[in-house]
């Protein structure tokens, strides 16, 4: 079945318009949502500020959206900061003293905060107090300021890099996992309605299968299919059009992109399937180690295409099969 697309005149608020505003609009992550809903409602019922929260997991899975939902749920403001920009106490003072009672203070990539800034957060999180230094030199003096009670929400793709003193100060910790294809179809169905795109379930499933279990990528692919159909298919969209649009992005039916294929090909064709170190792989494909570890490796492991060992990464038989290679070559069998 083919549908017409109603092209939006303005798409500048694309990401914000698709962001769920309450937990009932947040698809997937059932157990996490149940726990968070109970946690927030209990605090509201007691007329208290919710405890500090930490969300961790791969990028693009909704950690920032959960911070927005928390602010909407308790009816308070949201202040957003980025960990790499918070290196020293002076980077935090203005943000902390500007918070109103009950505000959500969201720090993305919290694991990348500077150590001095992190330690400055401890009394703010525990006692809602900070010390500031007035003047300098022999006449310098320290003054303790009271802060409005707030909820710190941290998001990280690398929970293991958080120090124990920081990690244990969070009252609520939740892992955000990759989404199922069914959950992504639900997300895409909602997004297509908001963007006035008519697409049937078959078409949305075609997009979901290639979205790597990630809502952010799924929504971006939906917009790309919409653009492709507008420019190449007379504003008509169906599963065949979606398949052609996604093939143009070099995304295969498993959701692997050009870098994924390069990684697997290097491991199989040049290192007999491994083990091979991540630094070697990074040089071979022209990416840095951190990008590969954060953006590519988790999905390859999830799909059973790569294994991590003490000696390095190893391509699995599924990887050989997906690339139409003979797994017997790995062991030099006849």
From Swiss-Prot:
InterPro entries: AAA+_ATPase, AAA_lid_4, DNA_helicase_Holl-junc_RuvB, P-loop_NTPase, RuvB-like_N, RuvB_C, WH-like_DNA-bd_sf, WH_DNA-bd_sf. Keywords: ATP-binding, Cytoplasm, DNA damage, DNA recombination, DNA repair, DNA-binding, Hydrolase, Nucleotide-binding. Its EC number is 3.6.4.-. Residues 180-250 are annotated as: Small ATPAse domain (RuvB-S). Its main location: cytoplasm. CDD domains: AAA. ATP binds at residues 18-19, 60, 63-65, 126-128, 169, 179, 216. One of its GO terms (biological process) is DNA recombination. Residues 1-179 are annotated as: Large ATPase domain (RuvB-L). It catalyses: ATP + H2O = ADP + phosphate + H(+). GO terms for cellular component: cytoplasm; Holliday junction resolvase complex. One of its GO terms (molecular function) is four-way junction helicase activity. It is an enzyme of class 3 (hydrolase). It is found in: Cytoplasm. Belongs to the RuvB family. Has 3 domains, the large (RuvB-L) and small ATPase (RuvB-S) domains and the C-terminal head (RuvB-H) domain. The head domain binds DNA, while the ATPase domains jointly bind ATP, ADP or are empty depending on the state of the subunit in the translocation cycle. During a single DNA translocation step the structure of each domain remains the same, but their relative positions change. This is Holliday junction branch migration complex subunit RuvB. It comes from Chlamydia trachomatis serovar A (strain ATCC VR-571B / DSM 19440 / HAR-13).
């Amino acid at each position: 079945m083919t549908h017409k697309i109603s092209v939006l005149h303005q798409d500048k608020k694309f990401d914000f318009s698709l962001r769920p505003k309450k937990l009932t609009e947040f698809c997937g992550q059932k157990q996490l949502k149940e726990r968070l809903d109970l946690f927030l409602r209990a605090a509201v019922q007691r007329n208290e500020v919710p405890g500090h929260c930490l969300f961790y997991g791969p990028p693009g899975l909704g950690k920032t959206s959960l911070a927005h939902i928390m602010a909407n749920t308790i009816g308070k403001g949201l202040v957003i900061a980025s960990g790499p920009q918070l290196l020293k106490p002076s980077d935090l003072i203005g943000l902390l003293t500007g918070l109103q009672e009950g505000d959500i203070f969201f720090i993305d990539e919290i694991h990348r905060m500077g150590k001095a800034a992190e330690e400055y957060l401890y009394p703010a999180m525990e006692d809602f107090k900070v010390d500031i230094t007035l003047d300098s030199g022999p006449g310098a003096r320290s003054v303790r300021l009271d802060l409005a009670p707030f909820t710190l929400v941290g998001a990280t793709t690398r929970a293991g890099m958080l120090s124990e003193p920081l990690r244990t100060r969070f009252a609520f910790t939740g892992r955000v996992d990759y989404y199922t294809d069914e959950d992504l179809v639900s997300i895409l169905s909602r997004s297509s309605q908001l963007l006035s795109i008519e697409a049937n379930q078959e078409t949305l499933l075609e997009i979901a299968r290639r979205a790597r279990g990630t809502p952010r990528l799924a929504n971006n692919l939906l917009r790309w299919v919409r653009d492709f159909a507008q420019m190449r298919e007379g504003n008509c969209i169906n599963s065949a059009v979606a398949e052609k649009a996604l093939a143009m992005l070099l995304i295969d039916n498993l959701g692997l992109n050009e870098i994924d294929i390069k990684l697997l090909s290097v491991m199989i064709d040049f290192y007999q399937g491994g083990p091979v170190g991540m630094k070697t792989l990074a040089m071979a494909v022209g990416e840095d180690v951190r990008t590969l570890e954060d953006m590519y490796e988790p999905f390859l492991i999830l799909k059973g295409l790569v294994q991590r060992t003490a000696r390095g990464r190893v391509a699995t038989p599924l990887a050989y099969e997906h690339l139409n290679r003979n797994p017997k070559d790995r062991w030099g069998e006849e």
